[in-house]
């Protein structure tokens, strides 16, 4: 397990979560010289966590549900001693997202103890047209800097 090796495992439907995952990876790679691998959980449901010291998990919320691939991954995975952080892209308020989704997942997997959780703005499309867009790439980049410090310190 490498100290600087980080996995970003995510699921995306409309692309917002993937955009955030790539922005976070870019900050960690370019500014903190961390080795980062991206895995789309819709394609690889069970990535091997052995080589990773840090795991970042990203998901969106659609129809008031966390993406199924991520929910199952969080519920069933034993993260061992790895450092885990979670981000969600949503149009809902932060506290409501944490209460409705993160707290429920932690009850199902009490060993899951994320170092940090962030809610980033989401985007809503109807019939292929964006009707609401609260995407904030700069906020995801700032959060990446914050978690990089936590990864190095703890």
Question: Over which residues does each language-model region extend?
Answer:
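FMN-binding flavodoxin-like domain, especially the glycine-rich phosphate-binding loop
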Residues: 2-6, 19, 27-32, 37, ...
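Nucleotide-activated donor-dependent transferases that construct or modify glycoconjugates
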Residues: 7-11
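Glycine-rich NAD(P) Rossmann-fold beta1-alpha1 loop
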Residues: 12-19
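Active-site signature of alpha/beta-hydrolase-fold catalytic machinery across serine-
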Residues: 23
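Short acidic loop-to-helix transition motifs that present clustered carboxylates
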Residues: 39-45
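Short amphipathic alpha-helix with an adjacent loop that forms part of the alpha/beta core around
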Residues: 45-51
């Amino acid at each position: 397990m490498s100290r600087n090796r980080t996995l970003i495992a995510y699921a995306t439907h409309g692309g917002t979560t993937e955009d955030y995952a790539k922005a976070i990876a870019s900050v960690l790679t370019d500014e903190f010289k961390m080795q980062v691998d991206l895995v789309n959980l819709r394609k690889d449901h069970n990535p091997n966590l052995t080589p990773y010291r840090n795991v970042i998990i990203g998901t969106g919320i659609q129809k008031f549900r966390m993406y199924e691939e991520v929910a199952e991954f969080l519920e069933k995975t034993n993260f061992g001693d790895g450092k885990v952080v979670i981000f969600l892209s949503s149009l809902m308020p932060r506290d409501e997202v944490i209460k409705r989704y993160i707290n429920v997942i932690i009850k199902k997997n009490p060993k899951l103890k994320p170092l940090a959780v962030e809610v980033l703005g989401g985007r809503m499309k109807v019939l292929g047209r964006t009707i609401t867009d609260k995407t904030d790439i700069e906020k995801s980049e700032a959060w990446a800097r914050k978690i990089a410090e936590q990864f190095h310190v703890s």
